[in-house]
């Protein structure tokens, strides 16, 4: 299984060649967080009449995992450790990372939002945009 951040889903939808190749080489099933589903949809809204269901169907092959209390507690523990190290992450990114961690799968991202030493010790994170 492969866990995709919204940045990767967006790049896949846009056909970014290196991202598409990397993800397809990993194989299905593709998983994501329900937070990522919202982030992708949020990037498409604004007309007042956006077909949200159609937007979601564009990446319908990616199964969303719901947030639950265990994931929220895991994210809280991660934030506690980060803050002890003098760092802090956005709540949404921690919820995504905690969801990925709950699966034990590689978290594939295409931005620098997940680059902390602690996080990379807890979750197998691959950043396809290492220079971001």
Regions found by a protein language model. Name each.
Residues 6, 69, 91-94:
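Conserved glycosyltransferase catalytic-site signature
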Residues 40, 90-106:
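Acidic, metal-associated active-site segment
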Residues 9-10, 19, 37-40, 72, ...:
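A generic structural signal for short hydrophobic patches within well-formed alpha-helices
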Residues 4-5, 32-33, 89-90, 111, ...:
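Histidine- and aromatic-rich ligand-binding microenvironments
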Residues 63-83:
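Acidic catalytic patch
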Residues 1-32, 44-57:
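Short, well-structured N-terminal submotif of metal-dependent ribonuclease cores
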Residues 101-132:
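Acidic, PIN/NYN-like endoribonuclease modules and their adjacent C-terminal/linker elements
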């Amino acid at each position: 299984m492969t866990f995709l951040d919204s940045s990767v889903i967006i790049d896949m939808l846009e056909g970014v060649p290196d991202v598409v190749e990397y993800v397809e080489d990993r194989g299905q099933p593709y998983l994501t967080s329900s937070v990522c589903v919202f982030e992708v949809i949020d990037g498409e809204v604004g007309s007042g009449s956006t077909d949200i269901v159609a937007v979601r169907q564009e990446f319908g092959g990616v199964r969303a995992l719901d947030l639950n209390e265990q994931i929220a507690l895991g994210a809280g523990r991660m934030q506690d450790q980060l803050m002890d190290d003098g760092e802090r992450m956005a709540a949404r990114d921690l919820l995504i990372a905690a969801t990925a961690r709950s699966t034990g799968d590689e978290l594939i991202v295409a931005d620098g939002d997940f680059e902390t030493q602690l996080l990379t010790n807890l979750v197998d994170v691959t950043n396809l945009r290492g220079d971001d």
